[in-house]
């Protein structure tokens, strides 16, 4: 039996972001009975309580009260507890799969402890987290240093995008590395609902551009809105994001005066998966503005559900969308929108078919989980 200890997600079942969804899907699509997953879970309870979720062993780690440093102590405490658990249960050759670089500045010490019990350390670096504008400069510097240390010490770096692996090898030289993408479900085959819940905003089916994503500057909201406002399109711009109460919303309004353009509709968040799938399916086109990170779940979902996708032109996005999308750069989205609206339906259908084919061949959760299981069973 191969025991895999997953550190760095908030736990199971998934309630939050990308890492949590990844762990949920990894456990839900488990194919091999020769793997036992042990998943750390952030908790208000005392460290050490064990729960069972599907086939996984979930072990709780008590949340500390150190503010922004909580994530560092969470990873540290999870590794320390897992090592004690491994010793007391006589587990041999465990794999530690750490999600994110947060603990990187201190990983050398814990790497020695892991090796001492015959274990291996695999790390998913989570894109280029240090580049995110939400972090103040000292935190960016810490995350960059942590990235460096993880690359130096890990037995294997698992990137979810070829662009991430290329960056790490360019930045840090020869490292043990492998690419396994993030996954998605095939939304094209999901019935969803007949009509998305957009009537209250006066939005018509098939007559809107769609943006879905976290409300952060590096997702290029300003660039998208500026170019949209100078366009002559009759379509609306529907933005699904967590903007309510965020100071960036007012800053963005002051920068762009988007409130003067009635075509721009901030509709808040949509957590109902069937509704969100319907909104994706009925969009004229999806605009993907993400500039930082690896394989983005939102882009995969768009390629699976939306026929026409306008994708920000960076290597991470090109490595995913390939020839199935139209690519735009800052200041040129208006031009790409015009191009999109002049495409013949046959051309749109070809792009949609290419996108669905890419998803089916590379990004379904069944395929991704199969790649992970092969790695865990053969690389330990």
Can you say where each PLM-predicted feature lies in the sequence?
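Conserved donor-binding/catalytic core segment of Leloir-type glycosyltransferases
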Residues: 5-7, 200-219, 225-232, 237-238
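N-terminal strand-loop element at the rim of the active site
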Residues: 7-15, 29-68, 163-171, 242-248
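Membrane-proximal helix-turn-helix segments that form the acceptor-binding/catalytic region
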Residues: 139-157
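Acidic donor-binding loop of glycosyltransferase active sites
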Residues: 278-294, 307-308
């Amino acid at each position: 039996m191969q025991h895999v200890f997953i550190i760095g997600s908030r736990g199971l079942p998934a309630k939050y972001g990308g890492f949590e969804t990844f762990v949920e899907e990894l456990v839900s699509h488990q194919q091999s009975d020769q793997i036992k997953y042990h998943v750390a879970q952030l908790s208000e309870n005392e460290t050490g309580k064990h729960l069972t979720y599907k086939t996984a062993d979930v072990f709780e780690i008590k949340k500390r009260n150190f503010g922004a440093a909580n994530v560092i102590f969470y990873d540290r405490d999870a590794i320390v507890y897992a090592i004690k658990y491994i010793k007391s249960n006589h587990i041999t050759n465990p794999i530690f799969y750490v999600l994110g670089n947060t603990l990187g500045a201190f990983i050398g010490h814990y790497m020695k402890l892991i090796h001492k019990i015959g274990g291996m350390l695999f790390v998913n670096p989570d894109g280029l987290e240090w580049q995110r504008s939400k972090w103040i400069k000292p935190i960016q510097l810490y995350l960059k240093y942590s990235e460096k240390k993880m690359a130096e010490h890990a037995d294997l770096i698992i990137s979810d995008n070829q662009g991430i692996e290329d960056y790490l090898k360019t930045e840090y030289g020869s490292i043990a590395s492998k690419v396994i993408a993030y996954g998605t479900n095939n939304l094209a085959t999901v019935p969803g609902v007949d009509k998305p819940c957009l009537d209250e905003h006066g939005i018509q089916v098939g007559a809107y551009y769609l943006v879905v994503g976290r409300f952060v500057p590096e997702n290029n909201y300003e660039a998208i809105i500026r170019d949209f406002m100078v366009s002559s399109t009759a379509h609306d711009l529907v933005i699904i994001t967590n903007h309510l109460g965020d100071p960036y919303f007012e800053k963005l309004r002051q920068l762009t005066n988007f409130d003067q353009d009635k075509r721009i509709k901030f509709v808040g968040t949509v957590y109902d998966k069937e509704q969100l799938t319907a909104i994706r399916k009925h969009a004229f086109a999806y605009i993907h503005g993400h500039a930082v990170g690896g394989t983005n779940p939102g882009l995969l979902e768009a390629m699976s559900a939306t026929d026409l996708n306008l994708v920000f032109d960076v290597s991470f996005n090109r490595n995913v969308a390939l020839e199935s999308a139209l690519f735009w750069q800052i200041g040129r989205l208006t031009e790409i929108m015009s191009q999109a609206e002049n495409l013949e339906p046959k051309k749109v259908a070809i792009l949609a078919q290419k996108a669905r084919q890419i998803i089916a061949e590379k990004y379904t959760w069944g395929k991704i989980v199969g790649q992970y299981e092969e790695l865990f069973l053969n690389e330990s």
